[in-house]
Structure formats: C-alpha cells, structure tokens
UniProtKB/Swiss-Prot annotation:
GO cellular component: bacterial-type flagellum basal body, rod
GO terms for biological process, alphabetical: bacterial-type flagellum-dependent swarming motility
InterPro entries: Flag_bb_rod_N (IPR001444), Flagellar_basal_body_rod_CS (IPR019776), Flg_bb/hook_C_dom (IPR010930), FlgC (IPR006299)
Organism: Buchnera aphidicola subsp. Acyrthosiphon pisum (strain APS)
Protein name: Flagellar basal-body rod protein FlgC
Length: 136
C-alpha cells in the first residue's frame, strides 16, 4: 500500500459522507411533504444511504462508496387529525416516517466522520512533508 493511497481512501470517505449529509438534509426538508400520485396523497418516504467497499484493482483494500440510496423500511406514522382534508374516515392521516432525532444523530455522525477524514489527510500530508525533509 502506497502512502499516497490514503488520499484516495480518505477522499472517497469524505465524498460518501458528503452525499449522506445531502440525503439527511433532504429527509429533514421533506418530512412534512406529500406526493400526489394516482389520485391519492402519499407522505414522503425517508431515504437511507447504503455504503460498500470500493476496492482498487487487484487489491484487498480500498475506500468507500455509496452502493444505493434506498427507501427507509420503517412504517409511516398515523396521526389523528380529523380536520385534515386528507384524513381517512377514522380521522387519521398517514405521515412521513422521517424521525428528526435519528436524522440529527446521523447528521452529527456523518459530520464527525467527514472531519476525521480531514484530519487523516492532514496527518498524511504532514508525514509526506517530513519524509521529504529527511534527506536535508
């Protein structure tokens, strides 16, 4: 493994975490949105990011990549709101499955991971610079 590979690995992790942050922002922004389809209103379905190993050719090591962005399988919420025009005959509306607390926790974790990879890049750069000055 070359020391320069660390830039590719940390960089791929930063790109993946950046995309995860975008999905989290989208979930939070759309949590109260509805979609009108086939004559019905449907709540926004939260998205989740699926990571996978992004190996270099002929190598067992590598970075990370987003293999898919999937719909969150958790159930929709039922909220009692009989005055809502979208309520069913029992007075319930179907609401998004976005959990703002979970999204904020995921946001903090993704941001910390991004910051940690920045530190990895800084450390690798520092090591390379020190290596270059050894011969002086």
């Amino acid at each position: 493994m070359s020391l320069l590979n660390i830039f590719n690995i940390a960089g791929s992790a930063m790109i993946a975490q950046s995309q995860k942050l975008n999905v989290i922002a989208s979930n939070l922004a759309n949590m109260d949105s509805t979609i009108y389809k086939n004559g019905k209103f449907y709540p926004y379905i939260a998205k989740q990011v699926v990571f996978s190993l992004d190996t270099a050719k002929n190598s067992k090591i590598g970075g990370v990549k987003i293999s898919a962005i999937i719909d969150d399988p958790s159930p929709m919420k039922l909220i009692y709101d009989p005055n809502n025009p979208m309520a069913n005959n029992k007075g319930y509306i179907l609401a998004s499955n976005v959990n703002p607390i979970t999204e904020m926790v995921n946001n903090i974790a993704a941001a910390r991971s991004y910051q940690a990879n920045i530190e990895v890049l800084k450390t690798a750069k520092s090591m390379i610079m020190k290596t270059l000055t050894i011969s002086e």
